[in-house]
């Protein structure tokens, strides 16, 4: 990476300078972060621990949960420290690392959501051949390709952004080191960077949304051919959750990055950015759990196992007390 900038660190201004409001926001985002970790890690443990969820659909879901947990962890802890500290400094390379990880996880999630839509199409269109069509030789490369695409996309923007000069200011009016607010404080010509951002985000969004739309068009045709109302209900329960997640995530990404720079508003975009980087990772486990019968049944099985284990331990303790002289 070619560092020609005069800045050796950046100051993340965050959401507010009001001390009382910062305490409230600290508690709010701490609760959101804890809930995000519990929800996503819990979903991963559930998928790994329940044999009935050992299929490609839930493998994708567990990977999505890991991406969401990492995405939130890349941004939230640093923001929490900023709320409680007078110094909101992040080093030059710390800022570059944060941007690289944020773009990696954000892009990976886009590709994963598209892969999950294709997986749903295969499962519903030809359920008898699902195990063959979506074998580990198919879905594991899809997961690897999603991560690879995210990493390549992140490298392009990280190198392009941090090759700029930041002699104008080192104050970033944002909650983390995102591309648009950094371009806003650069004293270099940013036309190429803006073009790269628009082109790559537009291309990735267009390709992944097209995959989702085509997959769900075929899914809809399959639903119309179904005679069983129970089968339709199950399809809607699994696909409804995914469609909700796709709509929320892709909608916010398009709003943030695919538009003219003249419409860029730091304050407004900071709120939207906070939602898709911190809010969505918290919402995804809720969306996929509440709308998915298999996940809810797996939760019940886990709870029953825990209750049975506790009951057996109690019986053993009672028996040992009985045997004691």
UniProtKB/Swiss-Prot annotation:
It is a multi-pass membrane protein. Keywords: Cell membrane, Disulfide bond, G-protein coupled receptor, Glycoprotein, Membrane, Olfaction, Receptor, Sensory transduction, Transducer, Transmembrane, Transmembrane helix. One of its GO terms (molecular function) is olfactory receptor activity. It is found in: Cell membrane. The keyword Oxidoreductase does not apply. Gene3D superfamilies: Rhodopsin 7-helix transmembrane proteins. The chain crosses the membrane at residues 23-43, 44-64, 98-118, 140-160, 195-215, 235-255, 270-290. Signal peptide: none annotated. Glycans are attached at residue 3. SUPFAM superfamilies: Family A G protein-coupled receptor-like (SSF81321). Disulfide bonds join 95-187. Residues 119-139, 216-234, 291-325 are cytoplasmic. GO terms for cellular component: membrane; plasma membrane. GO terms for biological process: G protein-coupled receptor signaling pathway; sensory perception of smell. Its main location: membrane. Residues 1-22, 65-97, 161-194, 256-269 are extracellular. Belongs to the G-protein coupled receptor 1 family. Potential odorant receptor. This is Olfactory receptor 5T18. It comes from Mus musculus.
